[in-house]
Swiss-Prot record:
GO molecular function: metal ion binding; ubiquinol-cytochrome-c reductase activity
Keyword Nucleus: no
Record flagged with keyword Electron transport: yes
Function: Component of the ubiquinol-cytochrome c reductase complex (complex III or cytochrome b-c1 complex) that is part of the mitochondrial respiratory chain. The b-c1 complex mediates electron transfer from ubiquinol to cytochrome c. Contributes to the generation of a proton gradient across the mitochondrial membrane that is then used for ATP synthesis.
Subunit structure: The cytochrome bc1 complex contains 11 subunits: 3 respiratory subunits (MT-CYB, CYC1 and UQCRFS1), 2 core proteins (UQCRC1 and UQCRC2) and 6 low-molecular weight proteins (UQCRH/QCR6, UQCRB/QCR7, UQCRQ/QCR8, UQCR10/QCR9, UQCR11/QCR10 and a cleavage product of UQCRFS1). This cytochrome bc1 complex then forms a dimer.
Co-factor binding details: Binds 2 heme b groups non-covalently.
This protein's name: Cytochrome b
UniProt source species: Kobus megaceros (Nile lechwe)
Membrane topology category: Multi-pass membrane protein
Miscellaneous comment text of the record: Heme 1 (or BL or b562) is low-potential and absorbs at about 562 nm, and heme 2 (or BH or b566) is high-potential and absorbs at about 566 nm.
Positions annotated to bind heme b b562: 83, 182
Transmembrane stretches, start-end: 33-53, 77-98, 113-133, 178-198, 226-246, 288-308, 320-340, 347-367
Cofactor(s) essential for the protein: heme b
Residues in coiled coil: none
Amino acid sequence: MTNMRKTHPLMKIVNNAFIDLPAPSNISSWWNFGSLLGICLILQILTGLFLAMHYTSDTTTAFSSVTHICRDVNYGWIIRYMHANGASMFFICLFMHVGRGLYYGSYIFLETWNIGVILLFTTMATAFMGYVLPWGQMSFWGATVITNLLSAIPYIGTNLVEWIWGGFSVDKATLTRFFAFHFILPFIIAAIAMVHLLFLHETGSNNPTGISSDTDKIPFHPYYTIKDILGALLLILMLMLLVLFAPDLLGDPDNYTPANPLNTPPHIKPEWYFLFAYAILRSIPNKLGGVLALILSILILVLMPLLHTSKQRSMMFRPISQCLFWILVADLLTLTWIGGQPVEHPYIIIGQLASIMYFLLILVLMPTASTIENNLLKW
């Protein structure tokens, strides 16, 4: 009799995705981040669910309810900090996952890549709305500044902002709807992630060489299940080190001050994982221009397949492109640093140069380098 896992309608799906899936024999640890993102999402949904049991989405009680969770709820503090730092781990995994995709040419799988970009946008929206919920100073002013960017849209901008706010400023209505959206979006992310996986399994995984691995496949289980478990253990170790030893390391002290519309914090800045985009936004001295640059800084990922001029898929055997890739990584780290600095000399000019460099690298230098490499190999 055939094994039940190969015949049962539900188990068959699991089997074909996680057990008998033919996987390339040479995928490195950079391929671990997909499963780690899945673990992060499950962890965020679970901790978020338990937080929602004690949280109240009203401006008068939101801040107090978070304090209540940390002080009075059994293990509330650990749930709260796992959720907050879990978001940071989520974005670390996201950036690594996208970086892997760029380096090894995974964007050639168009559907998988584009759904991935949609997932990135959705996750960023979810994280932004989650940051507003504790209703601290940075929550309130972050929400005010970011939602206000929509007013740069010609003609409908102001109406749009007031529609999102549910009034004439960030207030009760805004907090309530942000909580509702923050609750529902992770489930939408989970659904889109399923589609992401579905399209990936149509083609099979890419591998470090960028060459077809159809002639050299191994079963996902036990090889990559055990490898994923190791990755998961390391992820949980990193998360718990943060949660138990430095829970506020990545947070902003201003968020321990209740929201006050009459008092603006000296430096309004988002969580660390948005700082690179925030730096690009601030580097353009025009509101609409800044907003467009902000959106384009992420949306540029959609153009990657069009900007691929190399005859090789991966950067594994392309030293010039490798150098440019790591310069891009350094540039993003520079932007992240600048995003957290006050708007004054020399930070303004550094931010502007880093922003120009970001778009120049992706749109001009990397495609040019690929063409040069093609010619060097006399192709």
